[in-house]
């Protein structure tokens, strides 16, 4: 599992191979707050698949960055 740091958050990329041979985008945003760790799962669209793990991870990373940006700017219902 590849880990990426983005604006103080850790993003764990964990795209999964489908039985059909394609790849589905998956990631986890890890938030360290006070003495707690929160893990927020990020999933690509259910029907979207990619030809390679690299493509799926790239899409999962972009979705994760959007989630983090929304959290920072209050777009996720959190401040």
What are these regions (language model features)?
Residues 1-34:
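N-terminal segment of the canonical double-stranded RNA-binding domain
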Residues 38:
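Double-stranded RNA-binding/processing signature
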Residues 17, 30, 34-35, 69, ...:
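Compositionally biased, intrinsically disordered low-complexity regions
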């Amino acid at each position: 599992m590849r880990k990426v740091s983005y604006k103080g958050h850790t993003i764990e990329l964990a795209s999964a191979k489908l039985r059909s041979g394609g790849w589905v985008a998956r990631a986890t945003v890890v938030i360290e707050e006070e003495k707690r760790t929160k893990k927020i799962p990020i999933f690509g669209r259910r029907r979207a698949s990619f030809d390679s793990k690299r493509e799926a991870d790239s899409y999962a990373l972009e979705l994760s960055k959007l989630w983090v940006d929304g959290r920072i700017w209050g777009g996720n219902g959190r401040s």
